[in-house]
């Protein structure tokens, strides 16, 4: 009986094998997500300037070309996006546009295009961050962008069709990034990228939509 049960589980897992595009696969979180999902699914690794598949998420035409190349997928994961850090008194519209153009609109570009290239029941997982709820000095751009992304996901979830889901992962500062960003995050508990990657697994391999998965 146990043997038959195990065979059933193996068969079920094989049937759940998905084709997943990971945008930002060469970054710290992206690599951890690929490592977390690759044992169970077929992963398409997408970088910004390296690898077989590349995309400039700030350019909607580049995003469209990417999906023309990779075809239909079951899920997309975005761990990409740049932000600007600096004192409020020195912020200019040009500096503020860094986060708006890249992390915010770049990921929204991905979602808007991906909805038409996902198989029925597919999923979209984006990335925001703890600063949406816990602002820090010199982090106005990051707080604005992350909060907007959380809002976009909650709103988009009620309009997506064909059973497509959308969620977002909101991580704290990474342990791997403390050397560069640690002084901005005194008092924050850092998390390893491997732990953050579990939240992406929950989104991709789960059933919920409109969720903000906080890793903090």
Predicted feature residues:
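Conserved NAD(P)H cofactor-binding loop of Rossmann-fold oxidoreductase domains
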Residues: 77-86
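N-terminal Rossmann NAD(P)H-binding glycine-rich loop of SDR-like oxidoreductase domains
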Residues: 22-36
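Substrate-binding pocket helix/loop in short-chain dehydrogenase/reductase
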Residues: 87-88, 95-97
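Conserved Rossmann-fold cofactor-binding substructure of NAD(P)-dependent oxidoreductases
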Residues: 57-73
């Amino acid at each position: 009986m146990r043997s038959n049960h195990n065979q059933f589980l193996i068969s079920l897992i094989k049937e759940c094998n998905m084709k997943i595009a990971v945008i930002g696969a060469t970054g710290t979180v992206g690599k951890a997500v690929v490592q977390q999902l690759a044992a169970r699914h077929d992963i398409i690794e997408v970088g910004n300037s390296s690898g077989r598949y590349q995309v400039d998420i700030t350019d909607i035409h580049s995003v469209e070309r990417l999906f023309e190349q990779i075809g239909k997928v079951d899920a997309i994961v975005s761990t990409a996006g740049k932000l600007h850090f600096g004192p409020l008194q020195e912020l200019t519209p040009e500096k503020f546009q860094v986060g708006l153009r890249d992390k915010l609109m770049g990921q929204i570009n991905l979602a808007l295009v991906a909805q038409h290239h996902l198989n029925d029941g597919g999923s979209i997982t984006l990335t925001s961050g703890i600063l949406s709820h816990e602002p820090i000095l010199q982090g106005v751009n990051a707080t604005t962008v992350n909060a907007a992304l959380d809002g976009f996901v909650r709103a988009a979830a009620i309009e997506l069709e064909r059973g497509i889901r959308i969620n977002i992962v909101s991580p704290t500062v990474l342990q791997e990034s403390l050397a560069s960003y640690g002084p901005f995050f005194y008092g924050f508990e850092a998390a390893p990228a491997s732990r953050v990657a579990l939240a992406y697994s929950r989104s991709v391999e789960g059933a919920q939509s409109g969720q903000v998965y906080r890793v903090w």
